[in-house]
Swiss-Prot record:
Keyword Repeat: no
Tissues in which the UniProt entry reports expression: Expressed just outside the vascular bundles in the rosette stem and the leaf traces. Not detected in floral primordia.
PROSITE patterns: SANT
Lineage of the species this protein comes from: Eukaryota, Viridiplantae, Streptophyta, Embryophyta, Tracheophyta
GO molecular function per UniProt: DNA-binding transcription factor activity
Protein name in the entry: Protein RADIALIS-like 3
Gene for this chain: RL3
GO (cellular component) term, any one: nucleus
InterPro entries: Homeodomain-like_sf, RADIALIS-like, SANT/Myb, SANT_dom
Record-linked SUPFAM superfamilies: Homeodomain-like
Domain SANT: 7-62
Disulfide bonds: none
Miscellaneous comment in the UniProt entry for this protein: Assigned as a member of the MYB-related gene family, I-box-binding-like subfamily.
Length: 81
């Protein structure tokens, strides 16, 4: 994920990403002030930072689905957990 600045949007913790995912499920695209609500749910990020993070996520998904990047090859170790 390329960025022109080294703001807090450049680095997201695993916890922040999980909070981000949950907030996206809670606040859909029709929610008024969606990005402010998502930012509040994540904590420590601005509405602009969460909006940008979402745009990068969508771009990554589109790139994967278009075949630009191969799907990861997860090997099974024999345990189906």
């Amino acid at each position: 994920m390329a960025s022109n600045s080294m703001s807090s949007s450049a680095s997201w913790t695993r916890k922040e990403n999980k909070l981000f995912e949950r907030a996206l499920a809670t606040y859909d695209q029709d929610t008024p002030d969606r990005w402010h609500n998502v930012a509040r749910a994540v904590g420590g990020k601005s509405a602009e930072e969460v909006r940008r993070h979402y745009e990068l996520l969508i771009r990554d998904v589109n790139d994967i689905e278009s075949g630009r990047y191969p799907h990861p090859n997860y090997r099974s170790n024999g345990n189906n957990h």
